[in-house]
């Protein structure tokens, strides 16, 4: 999964797996977010953690790292944030450190460990935010969406504040609905969003799921999302419960990787 220079943006690189871009980073411009879903993650951060005072230090855990675009943005947006990244690909991490070094005192620590092992080693009530953005090639590993792992994520959350998950799927979203069912059993509030074309079944694409102990400012999120070049449509409440329907959460006994891509352009971490 090499780092490939972006010829249209000097100094920036893509992390590429096959024909899929896994990450895009300009180390000199951590505020510059190219991938649509990463922009939406930034909006979830703004509207989901709005109640945290500026003087309060936030702790964030990332399951999956790639080029560290989201950790870099958080460090830029909220300096002093403590961030731990669980990234099992030590070779990729070394290449990122060499070609896209983190700024001094970024607060970002990368551990060469998979998500389940990394989370199991962490103390309870540690994190204000968990970002699950991990792919094995073009698939989300099934072990990261099973109920047993979601229990571990719930254990980490201070006040069960927020978990943001990036996955890929297509209509009728059978796999994502099962994942959403597991999140809904453990967190009071849940949002699911994607681009209208994905909702309508026109193509395969990224979906974001945001589970939280306190309600996200959904009105503000929808307003700011609508201003983006590729806005997301967000569902919650009764509409979301109807969408989940009778889907049963995954467990370790029947876990499945996410569905394979169907040729659409996908953005990962």
Annotate each predicted stretch with a short phrase:
Residues 1-6, 22-30, 199-269:
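SAM/dcSAM-binding transferase cores
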Residues 9, 13, 32-155, 173, ...:
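The AdoMet/dcAdoMet-binding core of the Class I SAM-like
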Residues 9-25:
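A short, structured beta-strand/loop element
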Residues 18-20, 132, 214:
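Generic beta-structure capping elements
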Residues 20, 90, 115, 195-197:
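Residues that form or immediately flank small-molecule/cofactor binding pockets and catalytic motifs
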Residues 20-24, 135-138, 170:
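A short, flexible beta-alpha/helix-coil linker loop
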Residues 80-82, 105-107, 160, 187-189, ...:
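A generic structural signal for alpha->beta connector loops
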